[in-house]
Amino acid sequence: MGFASASREEKLKMLKTNKTRKTTKHLNRLAKRKKLSREIRDGMADIKSRKSADLRQRAVNIEDDFIADRQAHYENSDEDLPLDMMDADIDWENSAFANAKRRLEKKRSGVESDSDDEDDVEKKKRKFAGLLEEGHEELLPIKLKDGTLIRPTREKEVKEDEEEKSGDEEEEGEEDEPHREDFSHLSASELIAKRRELMQEFKDTIASHANMLLSNPQVNIVRLRDLYNLCNGEKIHSLVRESVQKLAIASTLQVLLDILPGYAIREQTAEEKAQKQKKETRNLVNYEESLLRYHLKYLQLCEKLSNKLVGKDRHNDESTFTFKMGILSVKALARIVVSAPHFNYSTNIVSSLVRLSLAKNETVIREVCEAIRTVFKEDIHLKITLFTARSISTLVTKRKGRVPPELLRTLLSMNITEVKDEDKKSGKDALIAKKYQIKKEKASKTAKKYKKQLARLEADLLEVEAEESMSKKLKNATEAMKFAFQSYFSILKRMPNSALLEPVLEGLSKFAHLLSIEFYEDIVSTMENMVQNENLKSLDQLHCINTVFVILSGDGQLLNIDPSKFYRLAYRVLNHLPFEKRPEQRKNQIIMAAKTLETMLVIRRKAVPLSRVAAFVKRLLSIATVLDDFPALCIVSLVRSLFIAHPKLSSMIEDEEGGAPGIYRPDIDDPDVANALASDVRDELSMLARRRNTELSRFANNILYGVPSTGIFKLNPQLSSLKPWILMGQLMDNAKDAYDKVESKYLDDLEKAAKKRNQSVTPKNINFHISNWLAASK
């Protein structure tokens, strides 16, 4: 179309274009001669930039579409979890990772297209002009009246022979797949060699995938999908499937632990997805989403395999493949939550582990509880501690207390020493208001005075902010302790068997100082009722007594409670210590007795009469004479601290007869009427000083000679400053022989002496026999 035949509007447009072109050429010539000002040059550059903006945006869109298409292809090529995950015995919809999986799928569905595989760009063949589609043939062309040529096509007819041939080829191809290859014709030696060959191939494959992931995880993240498929046993011959699955699960675990970032991956919001992102940012987001997806799939697989171990008499045979895969999955979940408690789905792993503690197999329970215990010990911010305590409390309530004792014992490892004081309020708001007031009055103040006041206020504000950050940890600690006490009270309410009482009472004894004051009277009343139960073990009785005195030593001292009954109970329990034959139980009893008596007689020394303390000293040293060396050392060290806290006890080691009138009654289980001040402890200390254990002999001589701090009977300050139970633990650890057997030599000698009188030694008369035995040994 020429200029003459064009319409008026088209002519104006053409004139405008020609004029613009001439003006542009003229300006370019002037620019080359450097005769244009900077403003005009900048204006020309801006016009060029705006004209080419569409082209640049089109190029960016093409690149973004290509990246999105590649990502969609990788995601569509991922295979969903196998249908056998929906086993009837696994409530998969209520599993720990079900909600996480649904959220991830919902997120993916928002950005993925719903196109079928046949519409995938990569799977489509390119179409060029003049080429026919596959499966079509061209017919004779048809020429129309206006000269246009039409080239009709039709589908090719496939011959039956060709169809059968192609079908046979497909079947042969399927049979040639490695995981379907038939080795039944091989001999035993050939089968072993073939298995070794296949295993080596899969080992090389796993090593290659792992190496690529570790060298550049962001580029090779798709290899994590290949490792997951091997964990699932896909395309692996049955000859080596079990071994390859175990190897793949262990290798994938280590790879995940090495590439997991040191932060939790946050899901992007809809606004963030709609925003334009840099290429590096988009690649990082795609990598994080892929890592999170495969990490979740791996956790779901481990949960599925480990859940097969839970139930009545379920797969307790440790030689089966199901059990081996289950225990391997339990260890994998445990290692992930211990090594990366900050990462996504850590709370889901904790929920799964807590539920796995209901397994009937001791190995599973031990692995689960050890992982939970480690999480408690290493948790700094107490966030995962709070969630774990809540999960345990929920399980205890749901199961009505029918949980393993080991699970409750894990609560003892919580790293909590204080809780938040609800009455203490932060003064941050008041300080901020004061800061604005000072700035408002700046004009009426001198510069020096203004800076001084502002600096002091800023320092106070920083201190308050530091306290608030610390209060978040205390808040988590407070909530965690609430759930722990809820578990304890739920079990005490139902009065279960003694196996559950021991960890509950031990927990109450350890955390009694963190109890809220409104529970004090109820706890003391409950402990009083329980400790009077004759079937309660000595260790549990000591836990009850210690709980009461921890309460009474703190805020509970304002309660109107007479503790004398608990002193009598503790005095009576001491007679049972020599009769415990199990080393671990004896050690725990001695430690608990030492802690309880220190609270009763040292911390509360101002509220305890001297006659009562003397009775405990006399009975403790009498019992120590028939104990083996390490427990005896713990008791003697405790008695030494009593002599320091109560100096008037020195009358019990003096040679002169200046004690209280009357006689000592060792057969009475009441320390207030035993009249121990009328006796002495020189015989007991002399016998203990003759022991072969060097430290025990030194401690006994130190007490016997008035607890001197100088001279030949002084003690090593590094040992004498330790708590009695810590001293015993250190010496046990440093001993050449492990404390795996209770030495009953001294108790046997006592029983032989009693047998000569045709009597037997019992907790009720042991002090009477010890007095006669010591008198005969002089």
Swiss-Prot record:
Residues 101-122, 151-186 are annotated as: Disordered. GO terms for molecular function: chromatin binding. One of its GO terms (cellular component) is nucleolus. It is found in: Nucleus, Nucleolus. Pfam families: CBF (PF03914), NOC3p (PF07540). The keyword Ion transport does not apply. This is Nucleolar complex protein 3 homolog. It comes from Caenorhabditis elegans. The lineage of its organism: Eukaryota, Metazoa, Ecdysozoa, Nematoda, Chromadorea.
